[in-house]
Structure formats: structure tokens, C-alpha cells
């Protein structure tokens, strides 16, 4: 792992993932979590301030990047909830089935190499009747914008930690045999080429 991945990328991701419009999407979703939470892509802990300690008993965060995790130290210290980290990607999570009440995924499916396998892992670990909460960015509905997503993604992925701006998030859920109760779609302020924002609560 080079200097960029160790020192520059974690700072850039922490800053980018905490900008106002993205933070507002997190604030809409995360407070709905309850019980034992499995958070995929916990990263620098951007979601931690939005968990309700009266509703959440424990957070199990999954993230393979030790360097971005170090940037969560202050947010972890300020959080009243017990936090455990598993330093792996989301495709193979060493947890028993049916132990989580809620799965939270925010701006992480874009980076997981095998996102469908990761979604199946989430459902394995989720208790019957549990819920998956997510906000993501993905494939733009406008074909002209989606063409640009396809053009920039090879380079964008290299500089943004594997992020794929044009992923078809609803299609990934369909491939994992998951259905939405509700799905809100919108462009948030910023370059549209970075994708449509999707929210499921």
C-alpha cells in the first residue's frame, strides 16, 4: 500500500463523505437503526453521531481499511454505544446468522468488489424481520450523464478508493433477491456525474 492510500486517500474520503448534502442523507437514514447494528463500510465513523443510543445497543462495523478507520477515533470516543470493528470487506463476514437487528450501508456499496455477495451476507446476518437501511449514489437515470459515469469510472475508481459512480444499485439488490418497501431517488447538490442519490428507510 503506497503513500497515497495510507495518508492522502483517508483524508480525502473523510472530507468528501462528510460534506453537507451527504451528511444530510445520513441524518435521514441512520436514526432509524435499532438493536444490534451491522454497519457495512463504517470507515471514518461519519454515521456515528446519528445513531440513537437509546435505540442502538451495539454497532458492529465492517471495513477493511485500517487507515480510514484510524480517522474515526474522535467520533468513536464521542459515541455512547459499544463499537466493534471487523477489518474485512463485506463479502465474507465472520459472524453467525440472524444476529443483527439492523444493517446500515451508506455510500459503501459503490466500493465493494462483489456487492451482490455482500448483500447476501448482510441478509444472512440479519434477523428475520430485521431491516436494511441505506443511502447510496449510483447510476444516473439520464443516459448522457451515465455515459460520462462510464467514461470516468476507471480513473475515478483508482483515485477514490475503488468507488464506482455508475453502479446500478437497485439492480444489485434485485440480484441479491432483495426488495424495497420504499426507495427515494434524487440528485443531491454537486456534480451529477457522481451519481443519483438513493435512500431506503
Predicted feature locations:
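Class I SAM-dependent methyltransferase SAM/SAH-binding core
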Residues: 38-40, 44-92
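A short acidic, Gly/Pro-enriched loop at the edge of an enzyme's catalytic core
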Residues: 91-103
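A short glycine-rich, Lys/Arg-flanked "PGG" loop and its adjoining helix->strand segment in the class I
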Residues: 116-128
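Conserved beta-strand signature within the Rossmann-like core of class I S-adenosyl-L-methionine
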Residues: 129-137
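Short alpha-helix
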Residues: 161-177
